[in-house]
Amino acid sequence: MTQEREKAIELALSQIEKQFGKGAIMRLGADEALPDIDAIPTGALSLDIALGVGGVPRGRVIEIYGPESSGKTTLALHIAAEAQKLGGIAAFVDAEHALDIGYARKLGVRTDDLLVSQPDTGEQALEIAEMLVRSGAVDVLVIDSVAALVPKAEIEGEMGDSHVGLQARLMSQALRKLTGIISKSNCCVIFINQIRMKIGVMFGSPETTTGGNALKFYASVRLDIRKIATLKQGDAVIGSRTKVKVVKNKVAPPFREVEFDIYYGEGISRLGDLLDLAVDRKIIDKSGAWFSYGSDRIGQGRENSRNFLKEHPEMVAEIEDKIYETAGIPRKGGKEEAA
């Protein structure tokens, strides 16, 4: 670069910084330019690995969507619990007015410290979300759900009135305002979304998410969560086998799929997930129905092996270390054993 051009660019940079403040523009090579992506664990180690950065990225918009009772809120509450374990503040905008505090507590959420809002309208919910993000003190904010963000005009109108595109416009405007401040505040904003069917679709998937297309564009990570099997103990249903597909990922390669168990009243089975991962990575040997780690026999059958690991946290920590090492992702926080 010639000296004149160098001087011209330096002058332009100084004018931009003078007018818009320090940090408005910077060279990518500078230390303070773009920090490494920090993440909050999801509560499922396999999903942390699939996301490529050890969890859901901070300072980004995340969308979790799927059919009813597929585990969307469970996953979001696990992320909130993990943020609290790391010393952060979690907030929950309960637009559906359906948050089960007892269940959240069972998943590890410190409910006494959880900030909860139950707004009357979609506008109120998104304004509260904006104020919380602007504070710069909230680490994770969950909005449950986009479908329940009903515009004020629809609430105040008659039951049969048509309000075409109102919610989509509301979401589009809110995300335009929110994206910049979310990035600056390093807050992870999670939108839970529902699925609807498009009428008359002949080819391709007829499924679509509510609230228009804006969220699809603004989200850095989109997770499609589905129940694929029922877990039983005898005749009693005790949980569900769940599959999560990373449909979109701006921070790592997308389209990875993982499976884990969600138990009723317990949430994601961290130890079951750990067992599956360790077998896949040849850290634990599976011969017939027997699971063994090194020279130690863990148990016969998956459930017995899971119970053995629950009683041996030092072995769990050792296996976790090996999984993190082979996956090449950083460990967040301390070595905590979770069922």
UniProtKB/Swiss-Prot annotation:
Belongs to the RecA family. One of its GO terms (biological process) is DNA recombination. Can catalyze the hydrolysis of ATP in the presence of single-stranded DNA, the ATP-dependent uptake of single-stranded DNA by duplex DNA, and the ATP-dependent hybridization of homologous single-stranded DNAs. It interacts with LexA causing its activation and leading to its autocatalytic cleavage. Keywords: ATP-binding, Cytoplasm, DNA damage, DNA recombination, DNA repair, DNA-binding, Nucleotide-binding, SOS response. InterPro entries: AAA+_ATPase (IPR003593), DNA_recomb/repair_RecA (IPR013765), DNA_recomb/repair_RecA_CS (IPR020584), P-loop_NTPase (IPR027417), RecA-like_C (IPR049261), RecA-like_N (IPR049428), RecA_ATP-bd (IPR020588), RecA_C_sf (IPR023400). This is Protein RecA. It comes from the Bacteria. SUPFAM superfamilies: P-loop containing nucleoside triphosphate hydrolases, RecA protein, C-terminal domain. It is found in: Cytoplasm. It holds the Pfam family RecA. Gene3D superfamilies: P-loop containing nucleotide triphosphate hydrolases. GO terms for molecular function: ATP binding; ATP hydrolysis activity; ATP-dependent DNA damage sensor activity; damaged DNA binding; single-stranded DNA binding. ATP binds at G66, P67, E68, S69, S70, G71, K72, T73. The keyword Cytoplasm applies. It comes from Geobacter metallireducens (strain ATCC 53774 / DSM 7210 / GS-15). GO terms for cellular component: cytosol.
